[in-house]
């Protein structure tokens, strides 16, 4: 039963992740060039620097799109290879963060929780984007839940620094509490998640089901 609880907790949303990635791409895709380079290299050298950074951005975007396409096609090895290229050549950009998230996703699918945790920790600790760090922490909690480290999963899911993930964090905390057989606490966490969730969200049905499941078990004890 505990294993089923953990699997239930994992079903949070590769779709949500994909939507966030695509939203990020739409907003930032062609804007990752050095707009402050003039102050560094001077006006005379700016055109050469601009061409260099634009070429790097275009190259990174090509690899990024390739990685997404491979992932959608289920080509795990190729998606991982593309992610490794981004990590190696573009680590200092948000492409590197997204590549680590992809590596973690693929590793989790294969049950390689150690590598998934390593990739997520890189983003959580080193990303310059708070939203990326918050997402990585959230996913790291879920991977620890799957790996059976409920104490660490609980620690990661318990934070005030949730950014825009106001529903996701209490939901994952509820999943952890459910696996710990703390059913009334899980219900409270799921209720907080539901309160923060947009009324029309596609996640509402699953979240409500988990809340009702925790409540029914607690009532029968």
PLM feature spans:
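Short Lys/Arg-rich amphipathic alpha-helical segments
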Residues: 32-35, 50, 74, 107, ...
